[in-house]
Regions:
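C-terminal or mid-to-C-terminal helical accessory/interaction module adjacent to the motor/catalytic core
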Residues: 137-222
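OB-fold/S1-family RNA-binding modules
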Residues: 51, 94-99, 139, 232-251, ...
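C-terminal helical "lid" subdomain and adjoining coupling/linker elements of P-loop NTPases
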Residues: 184, 203-251, 303
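Intrinsically disordered, low-complexity regulatory segments
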Residues: 1-170, 491
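Metal- or metallocofactor-binding catalytic centers and their adjacent structured scaffolds
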Residues: 244-289
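Conserved short loop/turn motifs at secondary-structure junctions
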Residues: 1-3, 99, 103-104, 185-188, ...
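Basic, low-complexity terminal or inter-domain segments flanking catalytic cores
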Residues: 2-3, 81, 118, 173, ...
């Protein structure tokens, strides 16, 4: 029996449909009388241990315990997936061999492999790489099963990412949260290997905008008349001339006006202007590449305002409908063995009236081989394209329709000719000044024809460059019109979801070490195609950023956390290098263990920075009357109370009164000499549920006792002799009380008699 394990139920059902007649069972589908069985995970059904599950002492956040580095990494089954895990485990026992049908990327590889490792599987495992779920693609993939061992590097890469994220997140989040609480802040400070430098991009962009000072500068535009037509030009500055700033902008309007007067005067006196340079080059622009997930997310964000997460979710739905290929692809190229599908896909487009695809598909040439067809650029998956399954546009949602059309048109562009144009540069000399004009003449529209009916985007207006008349060097022209143009520099734009995702992908532009930037240019950025959208959504959910209209703006909390982190955390240099290392683990260049050893060394350095950071005290919090540090609101077993942030050196506490510490109650407190649990003093407290006695060490001991006539009732449990009796009201009978063991030893409850336990 072959056992297929898919990433999630919808994908499992899609695979099963292509294997034969199936019968649905609990957590699986049997095909061909049990010869094949398809089961599935629910995404990751295993999760990392929390620190407190490695060691009880880690349940408390203590700086001296850091770093926490597991000697042996452990996973546990998620509670909600326990039943499905058991089903998978039992099915593996019956299987002759297993087929890993996880998504064709490093996370999909790990997702299935970690389950097989957890159950101790010894059966042979094959790997199926499904880039699409239509019948033809599934049948082809079934005929090309690989040995799962060939993908150990891919699995280890995902495992390295997971464990590195745990080390950074668990340790640095604890360290900075402890420091922030010492300063009087109450929220958890999350630190993420990718999340934090991504947040820093937003914070730094906001700071650039706030500190931006506009600069007014001037340019001189002159239109010249040639016998064959007009030539628009811009004045070329001389590098050593007066009035230029460090970026070669002319800041003096007087100089600009003087230049214009100089040209006009020369023209009025009959001084000729002459063409001194004519450069003409025939240029070609190859077909645009099909989309990867990130390039689609950027385009859909720009054009339709869709968030990266919306794009990912929508493309996932189209994939599961078998209409488009695997969505989480970082590739923009196509394998040559899929060229045979082109005629079918183009024929299907002949039925799509939207965006004129039917019209354009009629003129497409499936014999054209664009630069996108390149096997050398293909790894586990290829660019996003339509499958051979015909689409009924009427059945698609608005978002599905928009994204399908974007993907389809980019695919269609591969079967149109190259775009050809002639670029012309003209330089005109007059009165010892030079003016340059650039023109463009379209020779063959080619693939750009299918984008012509779109509204031109302001960032893609090459075709709108002027068409210059036929000219030659030495031709004389005359001055027609001149204008001094005032220009004002503008601040950088705030990020949108789409442009932030693009920045994550092009992270080499944002590293601090500019020498490193060049080497990272080929790096795939920080995060992955599958995770970037979730990281941006995570920043919103953590309230580190908010959205104003479509733009991302950092919150006060977002600014604060970036301000306290060292550059090693907030700049993407280190994270980008880690991503490059993960790629090297995937291709077998470096082993997992050496990567993790390196991460621990980096972590120790980052923890040293965290321990030495000086955070500004939260001035909004009350001050401890005994040591001068801030008081923090805490949750105790009997309700909220205020404790000194200097604990354990200072053990000052106070009850909460309408959100503030009530220090006046101390004058009314009654004390006894000794807490029977720890030996410290007991004090009487009047809480909202009545009067009781509590150990003064509310964080360390927190023993409590009932009050009877202004004295604590200290009675050992007669059942175990260890715990102490506590008083509680019966849930079944209002006004009736009973006593139970504080250690919950299981002894029968004792009924209350006049405020005391009714003991024999």
């Amino acid at each position: 029996m072959r056992l297929f394990i898919a990433e999630k139920p919808s994908l499992g059902r899609a695979i099963a449909e292509n294997l034969g007649k199936g019968v649905s069972k609990d957590g699986c589908i049997e095909i061909n009388n049990g010869q094949d069985i398809v089961t599935w995970c629910f995404g990751h059904i295993l999760e990392q241990y929390d620190p407190g599950e490695y060691d009880e002492r880690y349940k408390k956040w203590v700086m001296d315990d850091l770093p926490i580095v597991p000697e042996k990494w452990k996973l546990k089954v998620k509670k909600e997936a326990a039943k499905q895990f058991k089903i998978i485990k039992e099915l593996t026992k019956k299987a002759d061999y297993i087929i890993n049908a996880g998504d064709p990327d490093r996370e999909g590889q790990l997702l299935i492999d970690e389950v097989l490792l957890h159950i101790g599987n010894k059966k042979p495992v094959k790997r199926i790489l499904l880039n699409a779920l239509d019948q033809k693609s599934v049948v082809q993939a079934l005929g090309d099963l690989r040995d799962n061992k060939d993908y150990i590097g891919l699995r280890d890469s995902a495992l390295a990412r997971s464990q590195a994220d745990w080390l950074v997140g668990m340790n640095l989040s604890r360290a900075y949260t402890i420091k922030s609480r010492d300063a009087g802040y109450d929220s958890v400070v999350h630190v993420g290997r990718v999340q934090t430098p991504t947040l820093a991009l937003v914070v730094r962009r906001e700071e650039e905008i706030q500190h931006f000072k506009p600069t007014t500068h001037y340019a001189l535009q002159v239109i010249w008349q040639h016998e064959n037509g007009q030539i628009p030009t811009m004045w070329k500055f001389k590098p050593d001339m007066e009035g230029l700033d460090s970026e070669n902008r002319l800041l003096s309007k007087d100089i600009a006006d003087g230049l214009l007067s100089k040209i006009q005067s020369a023209a009025n006196h009959g001084d000729g202007a002459q063409i001194v340079v004519v450069e003409q080059k025939k240029k070609q622009e190859g077909q645009r590449l099909p989309y990867s997930l990130s390039t689609l997310q950027v385009e859909a964000g720009r054009k339709y305002g869709l968030t990266p997460q919306q794009v990912l979710d929508t493309m996932q739905s189209l994939y599961e409908m078998k209409l488009t290929t695997y969505p989480r692809s970082d590739c923009e190229y196509l394998p040559t063995n899929q060229m045979g599908d082109a005629s079918v896909i183009l024929k299907n487009m002949g039925n799509i009236e939207e965006d004129h695809l039917a019209e354009f598909s009629q003129r497409a040439d499936p014999q054209i081989v664009s630069r996108a067809w390149n096997d050398a650029k293909i790894s586990a998956h290829h660019a996003l394209i339509p499958t051979t399954v015909p689409v009924d546009m009427a059945k698609l949602s608005d978002e599905q329709k928009k994204l399908y059309l974007l993907v389809a048109r980019a695919y269609l562009a591969q079967f149109y000719p190259i775009h050809v144009y002639q670029a012309t540069k003209v330089v005109i000399s007059c009165a010892d000044e030079e003016f340059a004009g650039n023109g463009k003449t379209i020779l063959a529209m080619g693939w750009k024809e299918i984008y012509q009916k779109e509204k031109k985007d302001s960032d893609d207006n090459d075709e709108e460059a002027p068409v210059l008349p036929a000219v030659a060097e030495g031709d004389v022209v005359r001055y027609e019109q001149g204008t001094v143009k005032e220009k004002i520099t503008t601040p950088p734009k705030r990020f949108t979801d789409a442009t932030l995702l693009q920045a994550m992908k092009e992270i080499h532009k944002y590293v601090k070490d500019k020498e490193l930037a060049a080497s990272l240019k080929e790096c795939k950025g920080i995060g992955t195609e599958a995770t970037r959208a979730g990281i941006i959504e995570g920043l919103k959910k953590a309230r580190f950023v908010t959205t104003e209209k479509k733009f991302l703006v950092p919150t006060d909390m977002g600014r604060m956390v970036i301000s306290i982190f060292p550059d090693k955390i907030t700049y993407p240099d280190t994270t980008a290098l880690w991503e490059a290392d993960l790629d090297r683990i995937a291709d077998g260049s470096i082993p997992l263990n050496s990567f993790l050893t390196k991460q621990v060394d980096i972590l120790n350095s980052l923890l040293t920075d965290a321990k030495n950071v000086q955070m500004q005290t939260n001035k909004d919090l009350p001050i401890c009357p005994n040591c001068g540090k801030t008081m923090r609101l805490r949750k105790g077993k009997l309700g909220n109370f205020w404790g000194c942030s200097g604990y354990p050196d200072c053990k000052t506490t106070a009850p909460d009164k309408k959100g503030k510490p009530d220090f006046t109650v101390k004058k009314e407190e009654r004390h006894t000499d000794k807490c029977p649990s720890c030996g410290k003093k007991l004090r009487q407290i009047k809480g909202k549920f009545g009067t009781f006695w509590s150990c003064e060490d509310r964080e360390g001991c927190n023993a409590t006792f009932a009050d009877h006539k202004d004295k604590p009732v200290i009675v050992k449990c007669p059942g175990c002799g260890k715990g102490y009796l506590r008083r509680a009201e019966s849930k079944k009978k209002k006004g009736a009380y009973f006593w139970y063991c504080s250690d919950r030893c299981g002894a029968a409850p004792i009924w209350d008699k006049s405020g005391l336990p009714d003991l024999p």
